[in-house]
Amino acid sequence: MAYSFTEKKRIRKSFAKRATVHQVPFLLATQIESYTQFLQAETPAARRKTEGLQAAFNAIFPIASHNGLARMEFVSYHLSNPPFDVKECQQRGLTFHSALRAKVRLIINDRENPGKVKEVKEQEVYMGEIPLMTSTGSFVINGTERVIVSQLHRSPGVFFEHDKGKTHSSGKLLFSARIIPYRGSWLDFEFDPKDILYFRVDRRRKMPVTILLKSIGLTPEQILAHFFVFDNFTLQSEGAQLEFVPERLRGEVARFDIADKNGRVVVEKDKRINAKHIRDLDSAGTKLISVPEDYLLGRVLAKNIIDPDTGEVIANANDELTETVLENLREAGVKQIQTLYTNDLDQGPYMSQTLRVDETADQTAARIAIYRMMRPGEPPTEEAVEALFQRLFYSEESYDLSRVGRMKVNSRLSRPSGEGSMVLQDEDILETIKILVNLRNGKGEVDDIDHLGNRRVRCVGELAENQFRAGLSRVERAVKERLGQAETENLMPHDLINSKPISSAIREFFGSSQLSQFMDQTNPLSEITHKRRVSALGPGGLTRERAGFEVRDVHPTHYGRVCPIETPEGPNIGLINSLALYARLNEYGFLETPYRKVENSKLTDQVDYLSAIEEGKYVVAQANATVDAEGNLTDELVSAREGSERETRMVTPDRVQYIDVAPSQIVSAAASLVPFLEHDDANRALMGANMQRQAVPCLRPDKPLVGTGIERTVAVDSGTAVQAMRGGVVDYVDAMRIVIRVNDDEAVAGEVGVDIYNLIKYTRSNQNTNINQRPMVKVGDIVARGDVVADGASTDLGELALGQNMLVAFMPWNGYNFEDSILISERVVAEDRYTSIHIEELSVVARDTKLGPEEITRDISNLAEAQLARLDESGITYIGAEVEAGDVLVGKVTPKGETQLTPEEKLLRAIFGEKASDVKDTSLRVPSGMSGIVIDVQVFTREGVTRDKRAQSIIDDELKRYRLDLNDQLRIVEGDAFQRLERLLIDKTVNGGPKKLAKGAKLTKEYLAEIDKYHWFDIRPADEEVAAQLEAVKEAIEQKRHEFDLAFEEKRKKLTQGDELPPGVIKMVKVYLAVKRRLQPGDKMAGRHGNKGVVSKIVPIEDMPYMADGTPADIVLNPLGVPSRMNVGQILETHLGWAARGLGQRIGDMLKASAKAQELRPLLAQIYNESGKAEDLDSLSDAEVLELATNLKKGVPFATPVFDGAHEDEIRRMLDLAYPDDIAKEKGLTASKQQVTLHDGRTGEAFERPVTLGVMHMLKLHHLVDDKMHARSTGPYSLVTQQPLGGKAQFGGQRFGEMEVWALEAYGASYVLQEMLTVKSDDVNGRTKVYENIVKGEHSIDAGMPESFNVLVKEIRSLGIDIDLDRY
């Protein structure tokens, strides 16, 4: 196998037993593809599909005027180039967007002859701004990165369910059906406890369902014919004859003697009719059975019976037969009658009963009844009734099932799936009611609403399209009204279309929708997980309060589609999920997962993606099934899932149709990063997966020694590590940029064959963590497309590195690791292992106030020179300044209103003039509890305001950097051109040239080297073709120079034009502080198995427990944290990490002894190729083997993939290889090499029992004590109660609550209690007096009335109770 540029630097030894046929798909594909399909920006207008923006335009246009004389048609749209790039938008607080322009055609017909077109006006109209997605799947809205989370909602279609017996006290199941469109009114059908079937529209008042059936044109006779089979009777003078249908009689109790045609009694009265009786009647050729008169009574007629002579209706359909009715029938000479066949078991009389409840006479009355239900109180005119009924379910404007909905309706109603209109059909309603009645009759199954075949994902593109369509429909209303005036006032399309409704709908969605979230940017994993999140909440989804247990639970169809582990703890559990590693969306928005095809028990290389519904038809085996070298399933029985319930059963191999593509298919990206996940309890695995997202990037990232092999995929797909867009040779590298000269075969003709990667340096993330990229390549390195050329935050050699590898000992230590506390060695802090950099953004704005403009200046009165020392002449701090809490970062003064002057101020004014008193100092200072180094300053100035020197110097620096990029591109372009020229000119005959070159002379390399390259163009070749080529190269270079000059000019214009600032703001300054946070007691740490704790103490290195060879442990964890939590994965990780460290030390020792590559190869082969996946070490050169070995000195990285990881015997083998007996003895290892005899650092004595010691990857989480630590002396008070505010953000105090008061009462500390309740809280006069007393040096307290008592008195008075306090 071929290794990439970075992979061969440090190969991760994998223990995977199964080769992967299907690579993990690009992790951000769902987001990026969805939005690309929405915009279709790159697709030519003629070839655009009807989706996204195109679909929205097609749905609204054409718009016709009310009189039909004018109409506006949509032609096409295009998106302009964004005015600012992503970085500029973030700096300036703008939205990264593109202007949408649509070409529309206004057609005006002739008034006299409406069929004739009078004039056509075509124009491009501005339709608002559409935010663009960045290359990593996020959006920049008002300068901050946001993510649109996908929504999991109930799919449009038809669903059948029952209430599980909860509605009625008897526990009777009440069945219901619901037709849910994508857009439009919901239609519900439901049985009540009396078995009458009702319908509702949009959850309004219920009405008998037969009203709906009558309104679509059915008569009572037709309704009964649809829902019942009939019994045929021939009336006789006494009794009747029943047409014999065998199946209808079985199981019934005979109410009379039943005889065959020969008169032989086959079934006696009151006997139950069984199969033998039926056979006897059948064999006797019985066609008719004589029944007595009372057998007819109570039966229900199926059809209207009309007197053949008079045409009079004798009996109506659905009438019960009574003696009177029978008598009338006989009198009229009616012989044949049909009645409804019903029974108690599987043919209930539900529709017949419903018809009796229904009081409407015909179609018109039914529609009026529906109108009254929808519009109570409005008079039902014929047109209004008809219009409302059509609009409810039959109008494409107001009702849309969508392709998904039509497909789901058709498949549930057992029709061919793709066909049908997007509105409801009469047959849809009829079929739905039939299925519902059948369910009540005990036939068929209800739907499972939590099945992923009934829930679909709405992605960014679809959500944005819905918003855009909503905005466009508002525009449509306005255009409709104005179209009538288009002809008379000679209006153009842009006069009719106002883009504001579209812009505001889009802005509202991206800015404040529940699904538009502030991106979690703590580390690369949190970014990628946030973009792969699927939420059941949001508009059109569930709410936390109403979501029950079933919706939140793991469902069998989640397998391979949604992760069963990763979900938040708390009220959102189960409502917010993560996509599984291999999951993707199909065209309908349903989640699919890949399976490998199995034919005749043999695995093929064909991989098919199946949705939850499709999967139900197949038998799917698990990835851990035993397979031989040829790919045959060898076990007699294989564990597989089959049936719609997806129950796991043991099946024979020949029945298997598909097999999982990979064991990690079930879990999400975060869960698949947990090694030995299969050995962890699910609850702890959930915490482990969630806490990895909170890991703070460390100053020096350290790859996990025990990983799962997915680390590289996550790092690269998140966009944190920089990938080469095209292959080539590294031409230039510094900390800020990498320049790559692109390979000739990958460069596009006519374009610059240079790729420049400007690295992100010390940039603030949304969570204030530091994003910094470091180059990994050297000049001259050859890289291929997709190779990692620079590491980002939390990545190490292109692999995700969230924490640090720590030497962990599991043992108690003086109670300092009680209850999950963590003991840390001082060495960890000294080596900056967990030091992280956090970047704080502090900003100040200078506004134009009523009293005059605020000014950013260094000239501030009442400030000592020492406080201004860090400010430059413009009043802004310089980069590199070390600042602490209270230091001035930006000097600012605000004009003050004229006030009564004190004598002191009058004196100052007399001495210093006006300035001293009429402004107040409102400078930007470093907030309390913060200190750091200024790393960047941004100055934004309003258009028309003169820039200060600092702002100008920032612009000059930016232009200088840009010019550098252009110069590099030009240098490489010219270099290539001159190389081609040299090859072209050498040995060519010339007519003359510089330095008196003689005619007829041949050009030599030496001659060309002597003259300046630009003078080569002055050479006059004898060959005309060569001369033409020379001229062409000269023109090409000049053209490129011209292009670069234009680009530079455009950049200068962009930087020098005024900035867009909020109204009233003249100038804004942003100062970025880098704060260094070392690990300290109170910081939260965690492993990857849900084993979290708080640092309790940092112990001097000499006091830590140490091994026999003197190596001290880095961290001491409590062994009691493992058994009850059942996350044994951490112990296995510790053992394997211990082996990894040992192998690294062995390789390091060999390198110290100057071992050659050939000596290293046998050990490397033992490590990599004795178990698990084999590595192709022979393909590496000796230099590459030495580089690999150098990178392995700190430990050989292992990959133990989820559910396919290292077994115990493999861990033992690695431990034996890492610690041969001589080394093991020296370190004090036990025979198993999994435990060590440790010594107490303080006494030097060995501990009584051996201790589990090894290497674990530990993370420092974002809950840092520095962010929580807070102290207040005096500060702000609440306005009403006058009590101190709460919380760090408000600079609040600590609440002394009810229970704390009890504690002081219990101690009898009455004076302390009094001051707590008065002067330290809300006794306003008392606390002022205390301050005065302290200043005077008196230590006495006069406690007064707490303000909260006055509030209580006022509140009681507000209830009309006169309460007053008698003061004695």
Curated annotation (Swiss-Prot):
<dbReference type="InterPro" id="IPR007644">
    <property type="entry name" value="RNA_pol_bsu_protrusion"/>
</dbReference>
<dbReference type="Pfam" id="PF04560">
    <property type="entry name" value="RNA_pol_Rpb2_7"/>
</dbReference>
<dbReference type="Pfam" id="PF04565">
    <property type="entry name" value="RNA_pol_Rpb2_3"/>
</dbReference>
<dbReference type="InterPro" id="IPR007120">
    <property type="entry name" value="DNA-dir_RNAP_su2_dom"/>
</dbReference>
<dbReference type="Pfam" id="PF04561">
    <property type="entry name" value="RNA_pol_Rpb2_2"/>
</dbReference>
<keyword id="KW-0804">Transcription</keyword>
<keyword id="KW-0808">Transferase</keyword>
<dbReference type="GO" id="GO:0003677">
    <property type="term" value="F:DNA binding"/>
</dbReference>
<dbReference type="GO" id="GO:0006351">
    <property type="term" value="P:DNA-templated transcription"/>
</dbReference>
<dbReference type="GO" id="GO:0000428">
    <property type="term" value="C:DNA-directed RNA polymerase complex"/>
</dbReference>
<dbReference type="InterPro" id="IPR010243">
    <property type="entry name" value="RNA_pol_bsu_bac"/>
</dbReference>
<dbReference type="InterPro" id="IPR014724">
    <property type="entry name" value="RNA_pol_RPB2_OB-fold"/>
</dbReference>
<comment type="subunit">
    <text>The RNAP catalytic core consists of 2 alpha, 1 beta, 1 beta' and 1 omega subunit. When a sigma factor is associated with the core the holoenzyme is formed, which can initiate transcription.</text>
</comment>
<dbReference type="InterPro" id="IPR037034">
    <property type="entry name" value="RNA_pol_Rpb2_2_sf"/>
</dbReference>
<keyword id="KW-0548">Nucleotidyltransferase</keyword>
<dbReference type="InterPro" id="IPR007121">
    <property type="entry name" value="RNA_pol_bsu_CS"/>
</dbReference>
<dbReference type="InterPro" id="IPR019462">
    <property type="entry name" value="DNA-dir_RNA_pol_bsu_external_1"/>
</dbReference>
<dbReference type="Pfam" id="PF00562">
    <property type="entry name" value="RNA_pol_Rpb2_6"/>
</dbReference>
<dbReference type="GO" id="GO:0003899">
    <property type="term" value="F:DNA-directed RNA polymerase activity"/>
</dbReference>
<dbReference type="InterPro" id="IPR042107">
    <property type="entry name" value="DNA-dir_RNA_pol_bsu_ext_1_sf"/>
</dbReference>
<dbReference type="InterPro" id="IPR007641">
    <property type="entry name" value="RNA_pol_Rpb2_7"/>
</dbReference>
<dbReference type="InterPro" id="IPR037033">
    <property type="entry name" value="DNA-dir_RNAP_su2_hyb_sf"/>
</dbReference>
<dbReference type="GO" id="GO:0032549">
    <property type="term" value="F:ribonucleoside binding"/>
</dbReference>
<protein>
    <recommendedName>
        <fullName>DNA-directed RNA polymerase subunit beta</fullName>
        <ecNumber>2.7.7.6</ecNumber>
    </recommendedName>
</protein>
<dbReference type="InterPro" id="IPR007642">
    <property type="entry name" value="RNA_pol_Rpb2_2"/>
</dbReference>
<dbReference type="Pfam" id="PF04563">
    <property type="entry name" value="RNA_pol_Rpb2_1"/>
</dbReference>
<comment type="function">
    <text>DNA-dependent RNA polymerase catalyzes the transcription of DNA into RNA using the four ribonucleoside triphosphates as substrates.</text>
</comment>
<dbReference type="Pfam" id="PF10385">
    <property type="entry name" value="RNA_pol_Rpb2_45"/>
</dbReference>
<dbReference type="InterPro" id="IPR015712">
    <property type="entry name" value="DNA-dir_RNA_pol_su2"/>
</dbReference>
<dbReference type="InterPro" id="IPR007645">
    <property type="entry name" value="RNA_pol_Rpb2_3"/>
</dbReference>
<keyword id="KW-0240">DNA-directed RNA polymerase</keyword>
<comment type="similarity">
    <text>Belongs to the RNA polymerase beta chain family.</text>
</comment>
